[in-house]
Amino acid sequence: MAKRNSKAPLKKKIISSLIWLGTLPLCLYTLLTYLLSYSLIVEHWVAGFIMMTMPYAQLLCFISLIYWIFQRAKRALLPLIVLALGYGFIGRSISFNQPVASLTKPMTVMSYNVFGMYSNEYEAKKESLEELKKFIRDYDADIKCFQEFYSHSDRKAFHTVSFMKEKYPHYAFIPLKKQLFDSHEKMGLVVFSKYPIIHEEGEQFENSANGYLLTDIVKDQDTIRVINMQLWSMGIRVNKMTSKIRLQDYTDAQKEGRGIISSLRKGFIEHKKEMDKINRLIQKSPYPIIVVGDLNETPSGWAYGTIRERLKNSFEEAGSGFGFTLNRSPYLVRIDDQFFSKEWKAVNFQTLRNIKYSDHFPTVGQYILHGK
């Protein structure tokens, strides 16, 4: 009986030692994700992959913190310090802001990836298309930026530009993937505005179906710049891999896993090139600027980090909760964002998770210019 009792503490000690041996590299790895995200000095695609794993590393650090609090409190200091050092990054994923009252009527900006507007499945989605069109036209916003917006001059249901112009007389449209469409149709980035657009320019990124659209808009006595962008899509479909695992088809699951890693690698490389162009536009802007769109990357990624060096993020400054924007697997991510320059103050930011017409949710930010 005594021997059995003596073995139990030994077993517990061995388990505790193994967990501690796991805690040490975990904390070092988490610190590495911080270093890469703080400095942004390493531009290799592997750095992008490491940065993307930051929230998971922080979660594991939190679990280890709880464990050590109840096992050996002194050891809990290490994960606690690591989490404290990364507190600023936690704010990228969760916010607790409340709407700010303003004497000035804020300018409302919507951004929404509209998923091609069901252009490839019109017969099955007629009702959904009409509901989507009414929503994007009737929602009360001053400026609306859409990604994957579709228009076709020979299909009445897709006379979407003229439909939107009923309430938004000013617009700019840059078609993307022109080689995939005939002369009567186009899909790409569009900005609709209640206020005059005095300048527009845009570009499809090299080797990509994505791009940016820059517009200069005159509101009252002020000229403002709005950039609508969509970065390279990673093309990740996690549900394919998880379904293979559920079916115990581990060979195909491994193939899907390798495909995900390959897509991430390509995406990080392309995002670096694309964000170099976007950042140059931001730096050269003579006007207060708002940048919106589909980053196809999480807040711990390189693209988010590099734009955040130059602009504030609307979710962090005025949002609440987690702000997840993806309406498909893996769901619990935020890849659609709005950013603004120092001349602006964000007074409210929302993700409209009740609007489910697309595989993304719309984001809506409200802004006032300082001194107004």
What are the language-model segments listed below?
Residues 15-30, 35-69, 77-80, 202, ...:
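Metal-dependent phosphoester-hydrolase catalytic domains
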Residues 72-94:
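Internal/C-terminal transmembrane anchor helices
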Residues 101-110, 194-198, 208-253, 344, ...:
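Beta-strand-turn-beta hairpins that frame and shape the catalytic cleft
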Residues 1-13, 41:
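N-terminal Lys/Arg-rich, disordered targeting/topogenic segments
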